A protein has these predicted regions:
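Nuclease and nuclease-like effector domains acting on nucleic acids or nucleotide cofactors
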Residues: 1-97, 103-165
Length: 165
């Protein structure tokens, strides 16, 4: 009988760099349901979204005026501009996409998730089975910013052309 890691590899095409960090089938199903695909971002394996609208100006949501003292600046940033500055892109509601450490180790690959995929529908307990995190949050803050900048650098010339023309 195959172990679940091998089954997930065969089903998704994800490499060992991703699959070896998975704790459970339930965790893998969250990423599969989100339709994440494997890429290398800044030299690190990651599961990335293919459904982010990079041209969208999702910071223009009215509710964000209360959250950002400098909202006037951010309203003119599309999602590609945001990640170029090291900030997460935003979904159509204006909520930022979140980065999750697959397997909850400091050197784990990242998965790009919506808040709902990350924390809602019981996913928090599935994705964070150990209540005591080993993630250095200060280091992670810097990694998140670099990750999004590296994600921008990974755009092809054709993608950049589609976003800005």
């Amino acid at each position: 009988m195959k172990n679940f890691h091998q089954e997930i590899k065969e089903r998704t095409g994800w490499s060992d760099a991703i699959v070896r960090f998975l704790h459970s089938r339930e965790e893998a199903e969250i990423y599969i349901k989100a339709r994440l695909v494997e890429r290398r971002i800044g030299g690190r394996a990651a599961l990335v979204r293919t459904d982010i609208d990079w041209r969208a100006f999702n910071c223009r949501q009215e509710w964000l005026k209360e959250k950002f003292a400098d909202w006037d600046k951010w309203q003119d940033y599309n999602n590609a501009d945001l990640i170029g500055e090291g900030w997460p892109p935003r979904d159509s509601n204006g909520d930022p996409y979140e980065l999750h450490h697959i397997g909850q180790q400091q050197d784990s690959p990242f998965a790009e998730l919506t808040w709902q995929e990350h924390m809602g529908d019981g996913n928090n307990a599935i994705l964070h089975p150990n209540r005591e995190s080993v993630i250095d949050r200060q280091q992670f803050d810097g990694e998140k910013s670099r990750y999004w900048q590296d994600r921008f650098k990974a755009f092809s010339k054709e993608e950049i052309k589609r976003i800005y023309h």
